[in-house]
Amino acid sequence: MDTILHQTKSAFEFNFLYVIESLDVNDGDTLTGTELLKKLKPYAEQCKALSTALISVENAQQFREAMDFLRDKAAEGQRPVVHFEIHGTDAKDGLYIKNGDVIEWPEVLHSISEINYASGCNLLASFAVCYGQYLAQFINAGKRMPFCISLGSFEELYEDDLELRFFAFYKELLTSFNIDKAYQALLDADPNMPSNYSLIKADVLFANVIKDYLDTQCSRTALKLRAEDEMNANPAKFGHFTKEQRRQFIKDFRRCEREHHEQYYKESVEEYFQLREHPENKNRFLILDSTDALLQTFDE
């Protein structure tokens, strides 16, 4: 099956643009997903390898069926871009479906992760959804990446603004096939409104999650506190330790934990980037050999 290849780090192939829409005209909504596909039609027609489709969902069951359909199509060889035109909940905890059903972020994350896995780590997921990027807080670096790239906002979105921005984004993407140019087009599309959008690439996200883990759990101070907590929690084993023995235990504890988190890092890299199933991902994504190498990128 033909695909369009975008060549950068976090590169992805796509040959199908799906718009998942769950909006209610009776509640004053404009069918912005429907309108987006209409406006993109001439640009999509120029891409012979690209097809488009609108999937309207009325309730949670239909949403789940749509996600299963996209997963199965990806397994058959499609490389979908999935664009969501759905309300986000006021609680920022998920998607608000047309009939009032709520799909919470962990379920959304699981669904798109399955699509991404089936597509060989090629999923671009875009969210014309209020608070859509809150989904990222549930990502675990020790599990398979849920997408190649995610586009959305941590803020409330407004209909006119998102229409302008996502049209500009997809118009540029279908013209230049460059995700960074497309994102810049989105940022520049509406000078009358502040841009609250973010583009999250899977490899950059992984690096940030690992750095946060190292900073909070594996710093020199954090390891000292954990070693002291272990000794204090086991007086029968450590209560007789001299000051020098306690100091040596802390030193040994740090060394063992550093070896452990290096092993954890290597295992996480293999799982997150799906290197067993897709060894080519080693070259597709920015993957560093060690935690030291990863941390150095934040110092540059």
What are these regions (language model features)?
Residues 1-104, 118, 122-128, 222:
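A domain-level signal for caspase-like cysteine endopeptidase catalytic cores
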Residues 175-261:
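A conserved mid-domain beta-alpha-beta active-site/ligand-binding segment of alpha/beta enzyme cores
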Residues 34-35, 142-143, 167:
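Short, solvent-exposed amphipathic alpha-helical segments in soluble enzyme
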Residues 236-300:
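Extended non-globular C-terminal regions
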Residues 42-46, 76-80, 107-109, 150-153, ...:
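Glycine-rich loops and low-complexity Gly/Arg-rich segments
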Residues 163-174:
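Short, small-residue alpha-helix embedded
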